[in-house]
Amino acid sequence: MSEGRKLVSIRGLTVSSAHRVLIKSLDLDIAQGELLGIAGESGSGKTMLMRTLLNIPPEDVHFKADALQMFGADCLHLSDTEWRRTVGEHIGFVPQNTMFYLHPMLKIRQQIADSYVSHRKGTLRQGLARAEALLREVGFDDPERVLNSYAWELSGGMRQRVNIAMALMNSPELLIADEPTTALDCAIQRQIMDLFMKISRDTGIAIVMISHDLGMLQQYSRRTLVMYAGRMVESGSTETLFCTPAHPYTRALMGVSPSLSLQAGQRLAEIPGYVPDSGRETDACIFAPRCPYAGAECSTALQEQDLGGGHSCLCAKPGIGGHDHG
């Protein structure tokens, strides 16, 4: 990848709960400075992938991998404490729920500098000075008022800006944004996404954007990965993915992305069927029950197809039906 050195490299990641597979045999690289989008419906495994990376899996969920390296560390041989320290020092996280990281009973100033101090980046006074500067950078004209506010006194868009400032406190090399504009109106959504682009330009950090809306990723990411039922079904440059989508699920997802397909007064389309939460251990195509092009070959073990130029697809018939979405 041209952006820079690899910050994260994962090979053969499988995530499971006690009774089912959640993510199967997934490979992922994240390069320095890149803008990476990860798309898929709810239940596709996008958030579970990032929670595994951040070492905050749900209870009773475990993983195995052939390799998992981050920022020069071999995470397979780190203790939980060492892994969390690596995450805290190198990764900033912006959650989907704007209240997720903000304690309702504590003022913003009481929580925004915690990670900065705990990772020995500086004193509390230095942390608050940095917080004030970052709050200005994310668009607040009155950072002192924000620092003295409770989360419930701020609007959803303001809370998300606070979350972004918190994620930047430790000068991370990687920022992960999990559906960062959910529940925000369209104008605020665009402001938040434009803010991520400004952060990328100003700091050069890598940003991973998780979204169900491919149209949003088309505007803001340079490389896009499409996940379905715990698998990476297609990946490539965002331009290539949108010009020549190879997997039927990618094309179906384009058809239900609000910013790509929805006209004024029109009801959003849906992909028939649902994302399965069981049976993910199969080597066959798990999208086949929902795919209009499924055939006998889709019930055999799939191999990833290298389509050239960094474009790959997990499909027995890559490119089939492409004329439908030309």
Regions found by a protein language model. Give the residues of each.
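The feature captures the beta-strand-to-loop junction immediately N-terminal to the Walker
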Residues: 39-41
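ABC ATPase NBD coupling module
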Residues: 75-92, 118, 240-245, 276-282
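Hydrophobic anchor residue at the start of the ABC signature
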Residues: 112, 164, 175, 188, ...
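Short catalytic/signature loops enriched in Gly
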Residues: 144-145, 237-326
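Conserved ABC ATPase signature
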Residues: 149-154, 158
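A short, proline-enriched helix->beta-strand linker immediately N-terminal to the Walker B motif
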Residues: 169-173
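P-loop NTP-binding/switch modules centered on Walker-like glycine-rich loops
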Residues: 180, 184-266
